[in-house]
């Protein structure tokens, strides 16, 4: 509605309940792609004029990943529209504003005909990561910044699941361990930190946006998924999201939900990985009596031993003649002997 003096009133549709840090307004000369639909959700990509021809690939993965997450989480996308906006000179890689995700242009726009595989993979990963946040982070938000890993580690794991389902020929799980090598290199330092630690000042929260939160966090979640089984893990995630929808949660709440479906004490396995720094170096040795001896100690670059004990899911294969047997155990002590 236009008023006197060149003023006008703009009315916006009501939004769903959201955390204050997820509110965003994008104002400027921008153009929208043709919409696609996922259930009742209208999905569009937005760019500055002249770049709309670069939206097709991003729109494909945005649509595919949104469909994937609705199936995986068992919960429809909690809104009626989803806009993905390419912003020139955007400071961050992307930001999961609820219903209006903002991206650096290189993280959303690419020509599928001329883009390198690395460029296509980056767009797919970032778009899937941000869409995953619509549930982990947006539908359920961490209680405080010490729980940031609940947002970012889960979104990193979920991006891998979604992209692998969309483009299995990319073999993303084959490269998963390699791409997490940066976290291992940092976590071997004496100065490393736990995935979760107390946040008392803004600088503490800012320091959490690193490879330990994203890469190490996603790696230990993948380890847990493989330990309790993908279906049990997924059902625990669904319970967590359903229980805490439109609210706040912390690490303890996640363990409770996963424990209900796994029927085991998840904190016993996972707290060491989340709340203590570093990671274990597991060594296997076969004795002359055909005993397998497994030992663990914290890995460090320096020769000085560092304290630390983890519960480590271990799989090993035994071959006797033509018979092959795969066994699993949970290494809970510094040394374990298997006959």
PLM region spans:
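Hydrophobic residues positioned within well-ordered beta-strands of beta-sheet architectures
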Residues: 10, 43, 312-314
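Hydrophobic alpha-helical and helix-loop surface patches within well-folded domains
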Residues: 12, 31, 42-297, 301-303
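Extended, low-hydrophobicity, Ser/Thr/Pro/Gly-biased non-transmembrane segments
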Residues: 1-30, 57, 295
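Short, ordered beta-strand-loop transition motifs
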Residues: 2-8, 35-39, 285-290
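Short, intrinsically disordered, charge-balanced linker/junction segments flanking boundaries
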Residues: 1-2, 178, 334-339
């Amino acid at each position: 509605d236009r008023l006197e003096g060149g003023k006008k009133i703009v009315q916006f549709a009501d939004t769903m309940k959201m955390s204050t840090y997820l509110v965003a307004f994008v104002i400027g000369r921008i153009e929208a792609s043709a919409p696609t639909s996922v259930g009742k959700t209208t999905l569009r990509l937005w760019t500055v004029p002249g770049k709309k021809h670069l939206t097709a690939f991003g729109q494909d993965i945005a649509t595919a990943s949104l469909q994937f997450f609705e199936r995986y989480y068992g919960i429809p996308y909690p809104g009626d529209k989803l806009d993905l906006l390419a912003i020139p000179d955007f400071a961050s890689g992307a930001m999961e504003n609820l219903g209006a995700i903002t991206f650096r242009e290189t993280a959303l726009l690419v020509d599928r005909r001329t883009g390198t595989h690395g460029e296509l993979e980056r767009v797919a990963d970032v778009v899937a990561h941000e869409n995953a946040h619509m549930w982990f982070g947006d539908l359920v938000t961490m209680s405080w910044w010490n729980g940031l890993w609940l947002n970012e580690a889960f979104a990193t794991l979920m991006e891998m699941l979604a992209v692998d389902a969309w483009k299995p020929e990319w073999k993303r799980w084959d490269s998963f361990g390699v791409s997490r090598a940066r976290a291992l290199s940092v976590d071997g330092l004496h100065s490393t930190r736990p995935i979760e630690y107390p946040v008392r000042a803004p600088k503490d929260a800012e320091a959490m946006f690193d490879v330990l939160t994203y890469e190490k966090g996603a790696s230990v979640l993948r380890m847990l998924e493989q330990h309790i089984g993908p279906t049990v893990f997924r059902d625990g995630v669904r319970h967590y999201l359903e229980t805490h929808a439109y609210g706040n949660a912390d690490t303890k709440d996640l363990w409770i939900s996963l424990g209900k479906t796994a029927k085991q004490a998840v904190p016993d396995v996972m707290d060491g990985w989340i709340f203590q720094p570093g990671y274990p170096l597991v060594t296997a040795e076969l004795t002359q009596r055909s005993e397998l001896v497994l030992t663990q100690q914290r890995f460090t670059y320096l020769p000085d031993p560092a304290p630390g004990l983890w519960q480590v899911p271990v799989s090993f294969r035994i071959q006797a003649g033509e018979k092959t047997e795969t066994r699993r155990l949970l290494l809970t002590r510094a040394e374990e002997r298997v006959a």
